[in-house]
């Protein structure tokens, strides 16, 4: 059987249409796993439909609320490739739905839900049979009837909500829980399960998702800073230090903290990878002296870089790609919602097996000459610099600020972002976040009167800090955010980037430039609508874009 998936930037694009519709997608996801993820999403939509009904009766089920976004997160690009675990999530979704349904019936014997997903049952234990059942829920099944524009808007909402669900899970891990956010999530998820076909309603839904995600990023920020302190500028070594070692990748700061606690005094050094780099800026994480540095570059290079790393690797969230290519599948471990067939999975917070493996491996034989980069420009630090930025602008020492960030990826056209960064004039500042920074974060950019020209604000979710800074600057200057000498040039790859974009658009931010390509699920008509309404456009050339943005 074949699949249909068009959720990431590297999806196959042909004159006949966009999307991976083969035996395997560009990410390495098999048709089986992709189809079973469609089935899981349908089960989660049914669960959310009953959660909406339960809310009408004043019933809030925390097990449902904690599970639903986490399971949805497992379908995000480069997270879980393990078909049996995807089916396990679907079974758990149905079991929770039935328990929630029973709670509703106990209050009202006539309780019912009018949603096509509300009574979904899995037809078999056989993966092949389940894959055939999943064909009923493939996202483009009614494309001929509704057209590409409606399908594209549905997917914009589905993928945006998926990105928000990922951030909800990150926040939940840190003890952050908001009943209103979960209620809104269930309402949108259930509605998407009705296969809506009204263009205006779908556009409104996409903005609602963006607004909801702003709240999610707020509680995630509170969770991270509440537990680990506010990030402050910190130098990080990106070269090897002699000794045994473990590499930890993803976004989960709690996993990193637990690993650091358990490795303290063992002689094992810990390195961050990818989106874990900003962890070095948090006081409660950098206090561990054996958190010695950051290893590697963008996630897409992991098959080469992980193969060279002389210790075990822990994946706490996206992005994982096939570890068998570099023959390190015997020393990569997955956590939480991450999965790869045949790779060992850590069900809890005990990293002792990983530590034992690290102690049995060679580690780095010698320390390389250090190369230091600076991270840790968190929300408090950025807000503390607001008056300095305004002063520099007023004295014409600072002409423009470019927010240059987002996801990285393998496409060659992404060199645009390196070229753009190195072409930014000396009297301009670069604010960066997310893993797209690896395209230029090891380069030297100098400073403007002591203020670094390259300011690393953190992970993708730390777009929240950048938004708060922009709002603060606008308030102090008595203007709107769109009137600031500020331009957003964003790279995208997966669904977290989609929901960040929806968040910015829902807040009224205009004239954003994105690349390296437009999302494959957005038709020319939809791109035209977004351009007309928000000024959203794709990158062209560095020279043309720089000229246009500086003259705006």
Swiss-Prot record:
Main subcellular localisation: cytoplasm
Details of cofactor binding: Binds 1 [2Fe-2S] cluster. Binds 1 hybrid [4Fe-2O-2S] cluster.
Binding-site list for [2Fe-2S] cluster: 5, 8, 20, 27
Keywords per UniProt: 2Fe-2S, Cytoplasm, Iron, Iron-sulfur, Metal-binding, Oxidoreductase
Catalytic activity entry: A + NH4(+) + H2O = hydroxylamine + AH2 + H(+)
GO molecular function, one term: peroxidase activity
Transmembrane segments: none
Summary of the function given for this chain in its UniProt record: Catalyzes the reduction of hydroxylamine to form NH(3) and H(2)O.
Similarity remark: Belongs to the HCP family.
Protein name from the UniProt record: Hydroxylamine reductase
Protein's gene: hcp
């Amino acid at each position: 059987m074949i699949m249909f998936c068009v959720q990431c930037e590297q999806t196959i694009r042909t004159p006949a249409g966009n999307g991976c519709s083969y035996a395997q997608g560009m990410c390495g996801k098999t048709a089986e796993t992709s189809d079973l993820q469609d089935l899981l999403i349908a089960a989660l939509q049914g669960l959310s439909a009953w959660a909406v009904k339960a809310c009408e009766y004043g019933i809030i089920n925390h097990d449902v609320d904690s599970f639903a976004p986490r399971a949805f997160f497992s379908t995000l690009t480069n997270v879980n490739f393990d078909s049996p675990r995807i089916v396990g999530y679907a079974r758990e979704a149905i079991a929770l739905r039935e328990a929630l349904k029973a709670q509703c019936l106990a209050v009202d014997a006539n309780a019912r839900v009018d949603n096509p997903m509300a009574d979904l049952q899995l037809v078999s234990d056989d993966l092949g049979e389940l894959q055939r059942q999943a064909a009923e829920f493939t996202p483009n099944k009614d494309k001929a009837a509704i057209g590409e524009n409606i399908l594209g808007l549905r997917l914009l909402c589905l993928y945006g909500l998926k990105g928000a669900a990922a951030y909800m899970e990150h926040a939940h891990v840190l003890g952050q829980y908001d009943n209103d956010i979960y209620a809104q999530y269930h309402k949108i998820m259930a509605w998407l399960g009705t296969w809506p076909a009204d263009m205006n309603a779908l556009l409104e839904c996409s903005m609602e998702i963006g607004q909801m995600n702003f709240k999610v990023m707020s509680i995630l920020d509170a969770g991270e800073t509440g537990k680990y302190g506010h990030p402050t500028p910190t130098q990080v070594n990106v070269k090897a230090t002699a000794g045994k070692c473990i590499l930890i990748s993803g976004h989960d700061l709690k996993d990193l903290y637990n690993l650091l606690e358990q490795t303290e005094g063992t002689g094992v050094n810990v390195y961050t990878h990818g989106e874990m780099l900003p962890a070095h800026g948090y006081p409660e994480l950098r206090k561990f002296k054996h958190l010695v540095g950051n290893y590697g570059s963008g996630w897409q290079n992991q098959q080469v870089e992980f193969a060279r790393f002389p210790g075990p690797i822990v994946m706490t969230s996206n992005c994982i790609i096939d570890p068998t290519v570099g023959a390190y599948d015997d020393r990569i471990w997955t956590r939480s919602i991450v999965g790869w067939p045949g790779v060992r999975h850590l069900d809890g917070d005990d990293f002792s097996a990983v530590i034992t493996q690290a102690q049995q491996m060679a580690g780095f034989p010698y320390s390389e000459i250090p190369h230091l980069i600076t991270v840790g420009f968190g929300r408090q630090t950025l807000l503390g610099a607001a008056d300095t930025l305004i002063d520099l602008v007023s004295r014409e020492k600072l002409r423009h600020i470019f927010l240059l960030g987002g996801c990285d990826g393998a496409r060659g056209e992404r060199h645009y972002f390196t070229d753009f960064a190195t072409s930014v004039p000396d009297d301009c500042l670069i604010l960066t976040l997310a893993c797209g920074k690896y395209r230029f974060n090891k380069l030297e950019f100098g400073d403007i009167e002591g203020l670094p020209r390259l300011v690393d604000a953190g992970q993708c979710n730390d777009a929240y800090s950048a938004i708060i800074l922009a709002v603060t600057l606008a308030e102090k200057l008595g203007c709107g955010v769109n009137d600031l000498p500020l331009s957003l040039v964003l790279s995208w790859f997966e669904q977290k980037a989609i929901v960040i974009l929806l968040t910015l658009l829902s807040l009224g931010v205009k004239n954003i430039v994105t690349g390296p390509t437009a999302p494959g699920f957005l038709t020319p008509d939809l791109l035209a609508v977004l351009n007309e309404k928000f000024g959203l456009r794709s990158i062209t050339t560095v020279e043309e874009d720089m000229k246009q943005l500086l003259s705006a």
